[in-house]
Amino acid sequence: MRAIQATNADLVVICSYPLDSVGMVLAANEAKLNPKMIGGAMVGLQSTVFKTKLGPALNGYMNYDFWLPAKSLMFEGTEAFLKKYQERAAKAGVDPLGFYMAPFSYAYLDVLGKAITATKSLDDGKLADYLRKTTFKTVVGDVSFGKGGEWAKSRVFQAQFRGIKGNGVDQFKTTDTLAIITPAEFKSGNVIYPFEKARQ
């Protein structure tokens, strides 16, 4: 990190797995790394345990995410699903935020269930054909697929950590501390630039 700081980099892109993501944030913080923008594809920073461990050290980082509690991501059935799931998760003592994996996990099974019901089949070919030509209404919005099985329209977005104070979990229950920057249709905040401005 000190070598990167010595180059006075404008942009630092980090692609890392969970424990490395934590280590990179801590090392950058210790080295007082100060590019204009930092982040990228840091696996793990979506997890409550790492958000609360790193706390304010995350301020300013840009990272990918799939679902956050933004008004723009509240589709038909989303709030009812989250209420039910979060109550169960709390009773079980797991998933304190209750929204990183749950909405998409539910939507994936919902889509598969709808395809099986519509085709009355478990045949891979029939299911694949149906999945390719159908748009599904789910708790994560409309889901449709391209020719190769990929999403017809990507749902990965970039979000920026900001305004984190301390290590409490409750501050992560809104987009006040993790704003969706792109894509525009789901945007919940503007990028704070440069990095040091988001650190204040």
Predicted feature residues:
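Extracellular/periplasmic Venus flytrap/periplasmic-binding protein
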Residues: 1-32, 72-80
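Extracellular/periplasmic periplasmic-binding protein-like sensory domains
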Residues: 28-106, 117, 122, 175, ...
